[in-house]
């Protein structure tokens, strides 16, 4: 990951509108990870990541920034809600399961990467196994010299037909590895024991083969995955995954404000202060036992976020505040932001709806005045009712295009190739009354 902070922000701008301060903070944090890896070993261990606290109302891009960042970094990433956890000793998930889940995510990410690397070799091996199943063994006859040449020609002919997809629907009998996955359900907090039991059952069935009747297309995919799995060195993979978690892992903790003590409320709440106390060693740096081995959390980047409507960041326990040194405030969205969200990002909402309806042969075109009016209504409804940020646009667009989506097939024939123009008048006729009536907009929009 050698992108500069400016390049990271530029990439984030393709998907997220506004919130420049938050983008700059996460871009610097990500770049610092690369800078740290360039340092000598003795200095590298001393440099710890500066964890981030994002403060801002719902629907302004907190989660999306973290999600896009992880994708850019190609790093193990996990998003969790702080409200899902309870203090150690109580029924519920304990915070160490965050690192176990991150380890699983890292293993999955690296396995996919390794399997992509060996895909060509796996493809060739799978092809040979399918051809072996398609063609009977060579028969020994009087003219033994002619038989191999004839078999080779037949094999090449079948190989050509297989690659062209002519044999996809032909049924064959082939030996494949037996899937020995055992689904074990356990109460919250017992994830580690469940994982160990699943691994035990998986190892018991390792190497067992089972003869199955499958269509060539299905068999080819199954055998390809099996061959790729065989080519991947599991021990090496686990070692790489362990390093990826420790050096590049990113944990996004949402709804951190919900575990803050509100105002002067007395008593200790299991789901609040206890969770904060349990998070402290995790963020500061501790060792957690996972299926990859012992994971040190010293260099994992933690990004916490919350709306802080009913509480303040200062309501978090002081030690946790100290472990989230970088604070970024995300601003509430304006009508102008809504307008840009509808038109500027890569795969914007308007583009998604346009392409969805195009699959039925129906063309729709969002006019600039229509987008502007839609943005104004979204902002108005957020102001009058609950402010849910950009998520309001999903509700409005679904309502706006409900009739068009329902009758798309019929309209496509009736329009004769003409596009439906979504302008300000169209928006007003479908949403104007609902937006003006506060009681209706509260329950419908």
Curated annotation (Swiss-Prot):
- Residues in the signal sequence: none
- Gene for this chain: hslU
Name this polypeptide is given: ATP-dependent protease ATPase subunit HslU
| GO cellular component terms attached to this protein's record | HslUV protease complex
Q: List the InterPro entries hit by this protein, alphabetically.
A: AAA+_ATPase (IPR003593), ATP-dep_Clp_protease_ClpX (IPR050052), ATPase_AAA_core (IPR003959), Clp_ATPase_C (IPR019489), HslU (IPR004491), P-loop_NTPase (IPR027417)
Its biological purpose is as follows: ATPase subunit of a proteasome-like degradation complex; this subunit has chaperone activity. The binding of ATP and its subsequent hydrolysis by HslU are essential for unfolding of protein substrates subsequently hydrolyzed by HslV. HslU recognizes the N-terminal part of its protein substrates and unfolds these before they are guided to HslV for hydrolysis.
Upper taxonomic lineage: Bacteria, Pseudomonadati, Pseudomonadota, Gammaproteobacteria, Pseudomonadales
Entry annotated with the keyword ATP-binding: yes
Positions bound to ATP: 17, 59-64, 254, 319, 391
Where does this protein chiefly localize?
Answer: cytoplasm
- Record-linked PANTHER family: ATP-DEPENDENT CLP PROTEASE ATP-BINDING SUBUNIT CLPX-LIKE, MITOCHONDRIAL-RELATED, ATP-DEPENDENT PROTEASE ATPASE SUBUNIT HSLU
Keyword check for ATP-binding: yes
Q: Which organism is it from?
A: Pseudomonas fluorescens (strain SBW25)
How it assembles, according to the record, is: A double ring-shaped homohexamer of HslV is capped on each side by a ring-shaped HslU homohexamer. The assembly of the HslU/HslV complex is dependent on binding of ATP.
**Family per record:** Belongs to the ClpX chaperone family. HslU subfamily.
What are the BP-aspect GO terms? protein unfolding; proteolysis involved in protein catabolic process
